[in-house]
Amino acid sequence: MESIASSYRPISASLDHYYLRRPRLALALILIGYVVAATLYAVITPDWQNPDEPAHYNNIAYIAAGHGLPVLHAGDYDQEYLNALVSGGFPPHLSIASLRYEAYQPPLYYIAATPAFWLGNGNLLFVRLFNVFLGAVSLLLLYACMETVFPTKPLLTVGATAFVAFLPMHVAMSAAINNDGLAELLMLATMLTLLRWLKRRFYRSVAFSSSRTDSFERRTLLLLGVLLGLSMATKIYGYAAAPLVAGVVLLTVWLAPAAQLDQRLARPTRQNWRRALGAALWVLTPALLLTLPLWLRNLQLYGAWDLLGLQMHDRLVAGQPTTAAWIAQEGFVTYLERTMDFTFRSFWGVFGWLGVFMEPRIYTLLLAFTGVLMLGLLWALVRFICGRPEADMDRYQFWVLGLFGVMVLAVFASFAWYNLKFVQHQGRYLFWGLLPISAFVALAWRELMQPLQGKLTGLMARRTGCSAGGRRPAH
């Protein structure tokens, strides 16, 4: 075991800088590549040939015309008419004005996109390019998040950024009109603030409890709450992040961890618990105050307890296929197969209104690539179990990876919850978790660049491929 560990331990210390000497240059090239690719998507994609794009556009047009915030009404969703538009390629003689079924969405994105609408006099491309800009800012924030946690591991920072920048479906959605772009940006800004606060907590000095430091911490937590509230005012999945962020703050203040693995966690005390509750309230209070007006408005418009307008939305979209009806007609096994297959494909790329697929062999290659990444994560897990120096990480980085793991679980849980009602096996609904997902992708790929792990993974992949093909390669 010692001989195996020693075979890769020396190179692991300089692995990142061996392969990537100028990470900022790589980041610049990634940004340029993303902007070019996303702009081409925005220009070439025919009008309205993105999921729900007309309904999002109509929300912006409604605000730009001076009518105030959109309101969801009966008749704003007509499944037959929508099917006719999609199947006909949105012919010019059929109006999109009646597609207003996204009016229940939180309004911040539509308000932010209104100047782009005015600047282009309602031109679709101008608003699409606004989303391309949001995507570029999001990439910078994602890189900053990764660099905050792994400042000496550019393979992780650059790798995660590159994965998100060139994920085909994500590029397509970043070049379309929707509220996902601003929601991702605000989510990443929230995470960057949280990760920097966590880092300061883990590497705190003895004088951490001074009044000056406490004042700085309160301002940081207040900013965290404001960003979280803005995220909740942009996309409903911001609500899923609220308990996660507040829980991390509470747990960190309560346990008072240090970065060094050889330092024990402090024994939780009642005083620490009171401080932890206070810190969590500094986050939740501004977030809730920012969203309170939206709740009151929704209660007035849509009825008691419909804080988010979801009940009104569910009543209107009666024509959408429901999960219960699908299972009753096709069977549960078929439903699971469809869930896994279509979610996988649409995560990587199913374009238009989810009807334009890539070549089948591309999905096969992506499936093989995903399998290789799983092996890379397995190698990383073995390294973490071995502990330092093989792990090459401190407690702060381990905690962040744990947080990322919980975030991935939350993303898939919200995806499963939404699919309990309607059949919505769209991989793009996982994109609000691209920070942790891309971090694990980069971690797996970095592990595979270790000589021993790479050779063993290649051997396993070849044997698996031979078994799948039913024959051994000829000598």
Model-derived regions, located:
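Transmembrane-helix signature of polytopic, membrane-embedded enzymes
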Residues: 125, 142-166, 184-185, 203-206, ...
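Transmembrane-helix motifs of polytopic, lipid-linked glycan transferases
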Residues: 126-151, 189, 379
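Hydrophobic alpha-helical membrane-interfacial segments at the cytosolic entry of transmembrane helices
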Residues: 30, 226-227, 245-246, 265-295, ...
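Transmembrane signal-anchor helices characteristic of membrane glycosylation enzymes that use polyprenol
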Residues: 22-54, 61-90, 97, 282-300, ...
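Membrane-interface alpha helices of multi-pass inner-membrane proteins
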Residues: 220-236, 286
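Interfacial juxtamembrane loops and adjacent helix segments
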Residues: 61-127, 313-329, 336-337, 341, ...
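Perimembrane helix-loop-helix junctions
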Residues: 193-207, 214, 241-285, 295
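Membrane-lumen/periplasm interface segments of multi-pass, membrane-embedded glycan/lipid transferases
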Residues: 299-387
